[in-house]
Amino acid sequence: MDALLPHHDGSALHVSTQTPALGDTVTLRLRVPVGYGPLKAVRVRENPDHEPRWADARLTSAVAGWDWWEAEVVVDNPRHGYRWLLVHETTAAGGNAGRIEWLNQGGLHSIETLDSQDFALLATPAAPEWLAETVMYQVFPDRFARSSAADEHAKPEWAIAARWDEPVDPVLPGRSQQFYGGDLDGITEHLDHLLSLGVTMLYLTPVFPARSNHRYDASSFVDVDELLGGREALIRLVGEAHARGLKVIGDLTTNHSGDAHEWFQAALGKPDAPEGDFYYFTNDEHTEYVGWLGTPTLPKFNWNSQELRRRFIEGDDSVVANWLKAPYNFDGWRVDVANMTGRMGAEDLNEEVRQIIRRTMEDVNPDTVLLAESTNDAASDLQGDGWHGAMTYPSFTRPVWGWLTEPGDTSHVTADGSIDPEAWFFGQPIGGIPNYSARDFAEMTVRFTASIPWRIRVGNMNPLDTHDTARFRTHAPAENVPLALALSVTLPGVPVVFAGDEFGLSGDDGEMSRTPIPWGTETSPEVAPTLEIYRQLIALRTQLPTLSHGGLRWLHVADDALVFARESVEATVLVVVARSPLTVTLARNALAWVEPTASGVDGASPAFLAGDATLASSAAGLTLTAAAHTCAIWTLPGVEYPA
């Protein structure tokens, strides 16, 4: 039986005020299993102005097998860090102290811990509440749907036309110039598909004019690509989405533009142009410049330029503001290459840029969200001063691939037409997809969220894949899809569906995953079961507020199975994900449920079940069993709270 451990997280169960202001007093609560220790003292170690301060906690009551300790802290900094100190009732030889433990976001430790992994209160403006409650649906416009007007859009010289049923071309130039003709009205015509899935937010990859199918090489930020139907088509799409209760966010590239961009063309070879300092030119003639990762078609912005800031990100007339206002009414931005924005050698203006964007958005419409693309360790940028959350891979996507994929043929075609024998794994040259256990999954999830404040973590995206990655289904057996999707919708963060995942689509890398949607196959035996799994799990996420706002407590981590609970006063959501058979008995007070009986009590029926699982209560504890390739989710009574 797994031992119960002291627990605290940033949810409302344990933190009295989720959106404090500077100077506010906040009550912090720690849950300790009755009989743990015994403890001589419990203290909170704060770190205001980077100097430790101590607050004694008091034992308030024992409820349902847990002792509750409370302490008050005053919020002195925009990011106010703290951790718990547990002093045991032990004696030691000589003058040595007895046993102590530290509890931070990384877990329970016997030695001192890093400030960066402290729990954190944020006294900065919070994201809209709807962000934590959303289920995101990502659309790559060229590959989603063609409207009846698609044939009327003039094809530019760069585009290589393709039929909707034609395979994606992995080799340049087709890789970036193959054009299927999906447009914004096509998305509008299929909004009811999004409603049938149950998603609540549409995330559009770029819609600005460009010279590629992905449009991350924008030639303007003041227009909508006519290939997509132009501005009027965007207005129609957002209006129809809002009428159905769907939020819509756009995709903005603040790190670079395309080399055809009007600003770059105005500055190229013209040092004295008003746009002359918008980019990193490397010679006096302004004919040589820095491209993003050495790519000459993607010149990098120089955020030292005050005029660039004024036009792009600062104030009511900026690009950032324009698309949040009528008649377009975007509900926020996902910012491409946010991790590199403003960073160039010795210069680091990232903090300034993200804070300016955030202020502009709050001034224009505080009910909008700001998400960053930061695909590796994003913690240092996610401290509440700018981004509300991030598209980041090591805290969820990479570990879920490592645990639940089973790669077969991993070879794929690269951009130059050569064959890479190793499976694509997020651009990491590690020999393919690593073979992780469930323990590895849990460890990575904790490690890469330990330095991110809870309020930001619940706004981070939990994608199985995106337009920049191979598709999960490429290397995962069908029976593992419900397991992976269940983790996406039940762990803290924003579940993400990349359009086509619900159809079971595959793709070897980021370019090959941008597959046209096979409309008309929804009722086919190959697609219908996957669609139904998506609908059931998304419905569970949107119907249970505890999955959006509740705390997280790991109950059992084995080599090939996970058991955890999302908790609030209103409900406990128990989640079991097992790739191999599991039998485990949890302590009686591990969950709020029923009183023990000598004869045992039949378990509740799961709210979702893929595979086979049971939950039973007896005097010995709570016994869980699960067959291989099983996901089971139970909704149980909420946590009993001290009066």
Descriptions of predicted regions:
Residues 27-35, 44, 578-599:
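Surface-exposed beta-strand/loop patches in extracellular or lumenal glycoproteins
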Residues 617-643:
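C-terminal beta-strand-rich structural cap/linker in extracellular carbohydrate-active enzymes
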Residues 318-344, 466:
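Active-site groove signature of glycoside hydrolases
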Residues 140-201, 207-328, 353, 357-365, ...:
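Substrate-binding/active-site clefts of carbohydrate-active enzymes
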Residues 16-17, 555-593:
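Carbohydrate-binding surface patches
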Residues 1-133, 137, 200:
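Glycan-association/targeting regions that enable binding to alpha-glucans and other polysaccharides
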Residues 105-108, 130, 260, 264-270, ...:
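Conserved alpha/beta catalytic core and glycan-binding cleft of carbohydrate-active enzymes
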